């Protein structure tokens, strides 16, 4: 009896020591040590409320924001109130907004159970619907889509809260005579992906989204052209460098996933060569370059099995090969160094210096998703160029490493998610956050006055734009927290959107491991007794 009690005491001490060491290794966040992915998920969804345009709802949680853009579209005789500001300015750019909704919807569709278990189901649905409601509004006719509200040049000349803005709210559209296959295709993808998310909770709304998605895809495919050729004002901000081929394939594959209709898959197969789907082997995934994402969607079709004609199977296999090229590039396992993504000494994937964090967060999402697809299909490895192999566990580990880098596991010890951890950017390049809230001081702030009084001040922003992921450090892991350093301190909606899925997944994994450890501990104690 004494021996048994001694053993029990030893086990108890061991458990306490293990718990203490885990907490010390992390930041004592309440998740049992390490990073608090649940808090990061919560903050990420909160960020979208800071970016809202239009009439804010009664349950708005970001209280320093107010109604804005209430006359958007009025000059053109259309209702374009609502949607999201993409970053730290007050323009509504349709292409990155639609991409944000696609990624947020993909995250929700892929990690629905994990998001719900973290208590964020309602918030993710609200974040998606705020964007898709606007995208539906912007699609005013079968072959007409409003792609921008506001003018980047005049907007950037001023530093004003959204609630005060006096800059141009001119709206710009694409139509038959002024095509925009890229923005039409991305908007179709966003609405198709969102229709999957709302299928159970709001079936009528889901069908509405799908109807608009199908019309937009048909419009974009029938009247081809780059939207920045039709809307010159967007070129300096969101030029479509990759063209529209990736968006058309992306939209077709999302419509296939949403409807199950063979015709959309036939399109993705038939147009694979012409639109670059099986020709482009890329090392980045972003609001502009969608090839890696669509290649992964096509690979998923193949991995799910089914009776595919030989020609279909061969093309889908080409898609999978290109998808795995991207994933191997993130791991640095392709044979040619130029075929891999550069990595900083601190471990961050590095593509380019302007808002590099968008490439990091998108990579983390695609790595996470594909590791799950491998597991679900019974596979375990992918083949990289040159013959090297990589496992699903390696993909997942790289995804987690990038997520942890974002949250503070980096040489600077800085969380690049605003409001998370002890050290995070305090001078985010964000008009609304950098100026006193209109609720605290309702006095009008003029265009140039905002620069003089708020932009150039050295202190921290008066409002914390929690959940925003800023552009992040350079290729040497260096970061300068200054409002004028927009390449590093400006946050964008498409930086945070993919991390909603990643953080939900990592939190679920952490909780599952914690439960397993607790069960093992209880089992050990029972054996001792």
UniProtKB/Swiss-Prot annotation:
Highest rank taxon of the organism: Eukaryota
One GO biological process term: cellulose catabolic process
EC number: 3.2.1.4
Tissue spec. comment: Expressed in roots and flowers.
Organism name: Oryza sativa subsp. japonica (Rice)
Residues annotated as catalytic: 89, 429, 481, 490
Alphabetical keyword list: Carbohydrate metabolism, Cell wall biogenesis/degradation, Cellulose degradation, Glycoprotein, Glycosidase, Hydrolase, Polysaccharide degradation, Secreted, Signal
Family: Belongs to the glycosyl hydrolase 9 (cellulase E) family.
InterPro entries cross-referenced by the UniProt entry: 6-hairpin_glycosidase_sf, 6hp_glycosidase-like_sf, Glyco_hydro_9, Glyco_hydro_9_His_AS
Reactions catalysed, as given in the entry: Endohydrolysis of (1->4)-beta-D-glucosidic linkages in cellulose, lichenin and cereal beta-D-glucans
Glycosylated position list: 342
One Pfam family recorded for the sequence: Glyco_hydro_9
Leader peptide range in chain numbering: 1-24
Record's protein name: Endoglucanase 21
